[in-house]
Amino acid sequence: MSRRVVITGMGIYSCIGTSIEEVKQSLYEGKSGIVFDEERKEFGFQSALTGAVPKADLKDYLSRRQRISIGEETEYAYLATIEALKNAKIDDAFFDENEVGILYGNDSVSKAIIDAIDIVREKKDTALIGSGAIFKSMNSTVTMNLSTIFRLRGVNMTIN
């Protein structure tokens, strides 16, 4: 076989921790990360329980332009990827010298679609949605954005 897949690092950003070490500790301590979300109750969901993931702060990592063009899912995935790269001891030079790709699982990106519809209904103008809305609404948005940010040249796939 001339090509192979190697998993070299791990990273996580979740409701039970924002690093491998935090998640491991939460699992040992039996912490769930599940909270009662009043907003979900007000929207009429049958269950107001949800995993509360802390808001990501990317000001030290990405430019303003990069930050406004990515959705919440990509923010979390970006921080998990940074941890995975550190875990694997991979630096920027490695990307220039090797064909690297990523594989991410993504359930949905419905928030971007809902936000766009809300803007159109309120303002009656599709121009206010912004050109980046289409990319935020794609299930492949995480992989697409991360492959651009990290200048990846390998196969990049989204499983959903």
Describe the residue ranges of each PLM region.
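Conserved "HGTGT" condensation-loop signature of ketosynthase/thiolase-family condensing enzymes
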Residues: M1-V155
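Short beta->alpha junction loops
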Residues: T158-N160
